């Protein structure tokens, strides 16, 4: 457990309800299951002619993205809008941060605009925890991805994808393949899978892209793709994060694809009904063959759909937990 994850009680109110969503580490299985169940109920909203429920009417959700994103930012916007919240998205490239304003000052100024919730994506590990510790206690903080540390909503949408396609976790073999070292998605997935009872979690990649001590997550480590994929139910592919790499970790993308790219032939080693996932963006011909990404085993587009429902669940649950905490503190102050 990292020092960041040791701060996990910050996420819960006095009743054990979600008030911030910063990391999956340490969250009880019951709470993760509640998030999945709530998201399941929200999937129906997306099929309606009017895709809205009034749960966050009158609330303001501010998306503060210091890193580029398409799927995460857009699905958070849609999730908040479908909950009837007012939504602000900060364009960081034109914000005061480009003029030297600190992260803390930026959030303080946004807080003065009376936002009820911040969704924060940042290149630095721990940014979401820092904000949750220092902003007004009435404001809920949702981590949209921080450095290499965590991407909890991606982790949960991946769990929803697996549960909806496989029915549960208790008898599954799941392989996570690629750049494990730099992937916050891999960390969130390993934590969630273990908490939800998956008995066989595998990480597969070159030694240079496997974190030291990754076994502490309860995973089996493979450096041979064919061996690691044998009889798995779920394959989660990860992109090479060149922007986070330093030094010569890889000889070339072509060499990586030759050894670790998911092709139709290699997928044949998994179970016949295996599903293939990817958090995006996909690098075709680097970590995955187009025939696999677009094929019958792929549930990559389903992940995007489920992402809206998961983010609706997290936004609504965190706001409810904050409201309960506020009421508790007011009653005890009297």
Swiss-Prot record:
Superkingdom classification of source: Bacteria
Keywords assigned: Pyrimidine biosynthesis, Transferase
Gene Ontology biological process terms, A to Z: 'de novo' pyrimidine nucleobase biosynthetic process; 'de novo' UMP biosynthetic process; amino acid metabolic process
Positions contributing to carbamoyl phosphate binding: 71-72, 121, 151, 154, 280-281
Reaction(s) catalysed by this chain's protein: carbamoyl phosphate + L-aspartate = N-carbamoyl-L-aspartate + phosphate + H(+)
Molecular function via GO: amino acid binding; aspartate carbamoyltransferase activity
EC number: 2.1.3.2
Name under which the protein is recorded: Aspartate carbamoyltransferase catalytic subunit
Protein species of origin: Pseudomonas syringae pv. tomato (strain ATCC BAA-871 / DC3000)
């Amino acid at each position: 457990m990292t020092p960041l994850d040791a701060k996990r009680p910050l996420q819960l109110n006095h009743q054990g309800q979600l008030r911030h969503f910063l990391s999956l580490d340490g969250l009880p299985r019951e709470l993760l299951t509640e998030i999945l169940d709530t998201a399941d109920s929200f999937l129906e909203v997306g099929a309606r002619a009017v895709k809205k429920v009034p749960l966050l009417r009158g609330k303001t959700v501010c998306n503060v993205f210091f890193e580029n994103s398409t799927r995460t930012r857009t699905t958070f916007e849609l999730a908040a809008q479908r909950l009837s919240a007012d939504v602000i998205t900060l364009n960081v490239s034109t914000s005061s941060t480009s003029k030297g304003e600190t992260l803390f000052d930026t959030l303080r100024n946004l807080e003065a605009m009376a936002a009820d919730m911040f969704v924060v994506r940042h290149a630095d590990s721990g940014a979401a925890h820092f904000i949750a510790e220092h902003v007004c206690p009435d404001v809920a903080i949702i981590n949209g991805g921080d450095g290499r540390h965590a991407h909890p909503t991606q982790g949960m949408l991946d769990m929803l994808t697996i549960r909806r396609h496989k029915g549960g976790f208790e008898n599954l073999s799941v392989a996570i393949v690629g750049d494990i070292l730099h992937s916050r998605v891999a960390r969130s997935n390993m934590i969630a899978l273990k908490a939800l009872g998956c008995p066989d979690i595998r990480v597969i990649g070159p030694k240079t892209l496997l974190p030291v001590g990754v076994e502490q997550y309860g995973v089996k480590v493979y450096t041979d793709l064919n061996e690691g994929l044998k009889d798995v139910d779920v394959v989660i592919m990860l992109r090479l994060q060149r922007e986070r790499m330093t030094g010569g970790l890889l000889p070339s993308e072509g060499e990586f694809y030759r050894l670790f790219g998911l092709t139709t032939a290699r997928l044949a080693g998994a179970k016949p009904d295996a599903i293939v996932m990817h958090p995006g963006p996909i690098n075709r011909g680097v970590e995955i063959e187009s025939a696999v990404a677009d094929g019958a085993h792929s549930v990559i587009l389903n992940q995007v759909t489920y992402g809206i429902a998961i983010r609706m669940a997290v936004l609504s649950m965190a706001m409810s937990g904050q409201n309960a905490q506020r009421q508790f503190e007011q009653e005890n102050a009297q």
